[in-house]
């Protein structure tokens, strides 16, 4: 399916040079992964989707349980993409493969997309000490933050709310501000945690819920000042802006 918006371009992702992409942070990770998959297929790429934590199961999608290499190859040939993961019957969720299996599967595809964090649909989070679970083979890390957290109390909008409250040095009932989002996105104790020397991008989701674009633009500009490439938009209507120059484009979540 062709799209008016190219998220790969807007997030400045060089998937030829950096083919293993880990996605961390708040709600919207899975939707972003599926959107990137769609774009990559349009470009003729073979894509493996996987997780190092858990990911919502989708029974109608091509799936190779346990990352079985023969099945992965078969589905890549047929569908151009495959979800390779374990499967938990009791939760209905995809579950993680081993690092060794990820390294093996990496050789079978052009691009691997990895959901490497959990947030239980909360728009923002500050990771605990065991989070995120970025695989060793990852080249790029994209952190996702939902702009619907702006102005909302930490207790209502943040996953790991106590950790987020402690990190921001605010009460649980304090609202999340633009400055808080910048801090969370760029701190090594926030979503920049364990990124190390990898390429880093920030995607601010759900801009469609904002009455005005200025808060999102301000966050992106502040991230740019900190040498962080960022874009805001909606996987619903694809209205996006990337630093350093604004781009407003309409399309489809």
What are the roles of these predicted feature ranges?
Residues 3-13:
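Pre-Walker A adenine-sensing motif
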Residues 13-40:
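Walker A (P-loop) phosphate-binding motif
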Residues 23, 48-51, 83-86, 112-116, ...:
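General beta-strand structural signal in soluble alpha/beta enzymes
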Residues 39-85:
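N-terminal phosphate/diphosphate-binding loop that engages ATP/GTP or pyrophosphate donors
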Residues 74-101, 110:
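Ligand-binding beta-strand-loop-alpha-helix segment within the catalytic cores
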Residues 91-98, 117-225:
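Conserved catalytic-core segment of NTP-binding enzymes
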Residues 222-240:
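Canonical P-loop GTPase G-domain recognition
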Residues 241-253:
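Single conserved hydrophobic/aromatic residue that forms the stacking wall/gate
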């Amino acid at each position: 399916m062709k799209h008016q918006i190219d998220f790969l371009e807007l997030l400045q992702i060089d998937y030829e040079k950096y083919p293993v992409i880990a996605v961390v942070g708040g709600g919207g990770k899975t939707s972003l992964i599926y959107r990137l998959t769609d774009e990559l297929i349009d470009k003729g790429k073979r894509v493996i989707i996987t997780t190092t934590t858990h990911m919502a199961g989708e029974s109608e999608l091509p799936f190779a349980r346990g990352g079985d290499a023969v099945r992965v190859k078969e589905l890549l040939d047929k569908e151009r993409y495959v979800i390779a993961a374990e499967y938990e019957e009791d939760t209905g969720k995809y579950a993680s493969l081993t690092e060794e299996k990820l390294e093996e599967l990496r050789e079978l595809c052009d691009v691997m997309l990895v959901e490497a964090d959990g947030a239980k649909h909360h728009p923002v989070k500050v990771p605990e000490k065991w989070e995120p679970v970025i695989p060793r083979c990852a080249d790029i890390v994209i952190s996702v933050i939902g702009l619907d957290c702006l102005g909302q109390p930490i207790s209502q909008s943040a996953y790991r709310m106590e950790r987020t409250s402690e990190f921001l040095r605010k009460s649980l009932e304090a609202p999340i501000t633009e400055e808080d989002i910048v801090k969370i996105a760029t701190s090594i104790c926030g979503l920049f945690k364990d990124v190390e020397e990898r390429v880093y991008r920030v995607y601010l989701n759900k801009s469609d819920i904002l009455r005005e674009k200025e808060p999102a633009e301000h966050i992106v500009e502040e991230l740019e000042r900190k040498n962080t490439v960022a874009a805001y938009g909606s996987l619903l209507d694809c209205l996006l802006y990337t630093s350093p120059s604004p781009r407003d484009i309409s399309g489809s979540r």
